[in-house]
Design a protein with these regions (language model features):
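Conserved phosphate-binding/catalytic region of the ribokinase-like
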Residues: 4, 167, 197-297
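Alpha-helix C-terminal capping segments
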Residues: 45-54, 98, 258-263
């Protein structure tokens, strides 16, 4: 089985439902407060593990919530040999306000800002040709760049979820095999909001012209579109009653990667990822909302 190294963020999500987004200076009453282990990196690592892949988390936690975050990852079958604890800083924190089944997120990177070359070297020394490295942008971009440089030197496949969207430093895109943004991120990167199929195709072409090898854009309720080897690939969304979209994108990334690592086609992997994320949004929470492989029909 191919190893999948997720080099990324590990957060504690502090979640509260709100009837609406408060105005400046306004205090309102929320409900259903929860503490949920999260972070895009950790969520994707859990998704990989729950959906059939060999998941290895590479990241850092701090004093606050650190032990709990590691124990939670391990409980889902994620290898935590490359998760380091830092004593003098908090773990990453995400404050998530849920309004009408959608969410707004504020991050404090905390220990995620300390993911460095030493940690990456320690993890990827154990990687073999054909393994996978997955990154997001909740850790320093220099660390993403380095992880991908090491990955390509060892013959690994690299996957970038460019979230939160930010201008990419030189050296990342050219070492990215799969670039997987959502609609909002796509618009921020290339100025095209892919809210129709024609615009999604246009966005894929423009990303290819910018140097992306394989593009997969998630389109929410419209499914997802990919452009690979000069061909478009589509996957439909599955209609469900969404309750919480917090981990939908992370589920998609993890499911897609797990399936690709098994040798599946991109089309099959995208359909599998759509099925998995459609289940996630019907449940509250982040990692606990991600389905297991045996739940995907």
């Amino acid at each position: 089985m191919k190893k999948i190294f997720i080099v990324g963020s590990i957060n504690m999500d502090l979640v509260i439902d709100s009837p609406y987004m408060p105005e400046n200076g306004e205090t309102i009453t929320g409900s259903n407060f929860m503490e949920n282990p999260g972070g895009k990196g950790a969520n994707q690592a859990v998704a990989v593990s729950k959906l059939g892949g060999a998941s290895y988390m590479v990241g850092k936690v701090g004093k606050a919530f650190g032990r709990e975050l590691k124990e939670t990852l391990s409980s889902y079958g994620v290898n935590i040999d490359y998760v380091k604890e830092e004593e003098n800083i908090s773990s990453g924190i995400a404050v998530i306000v849920v309004v009408d089944h959608d969410n707004r997120i504020i991050l404090d990177k905390g220990s995620n800002a300390l993911v460095d070359k030493k940690l990456i070297d320690n993890a990827l020394k154990d990687a073999n040709e054909g393994d996978y490295v997955v990154c997001q942008l909740e850790i320093p971009q220099e660390s993403v760049k380095y992880a991908f440089e090491v990955a390509k030197s060892k013959g690994l496949t690299t996957i970038l979820n460019p979230a939160p969207a930010a201008k990419l430093i030189d050296g990342i895109l050219e070492n990215t095999d799969y670039f997987i943004p959502n609609q909002t991120e796509t618009e921020l990167y290339i100025g095209i909001l892919p809210d129709t199929i024609d615009k999604a195709k246009e966005a894929c072409i423009k990303l290819t012209e910018a140097g992306v090898k394989n593009t997969v854009i998630t389109l929410g309720t419209k499914g997802s579109i990919a452009y690979s080897n000069s061909k478009f690939v589509f996957a439909n969304a599955y209609k469900v009653e969404a309750i919480d979209t917090t981990a939908a994108g992370d589920t998609y990334i993890g499911a897609l990667t797990a399936k690709l690592s098994e040798g599946s086609s991109l089309e099959d992997a995208m359909d599998y990822a759509s099925k998995a994320s459609s289940i996630t949004v019907t449940r509250r929470g982040a990692q606990k909302s991600i389905p297991y492989k045996n739940e995907i029909k």
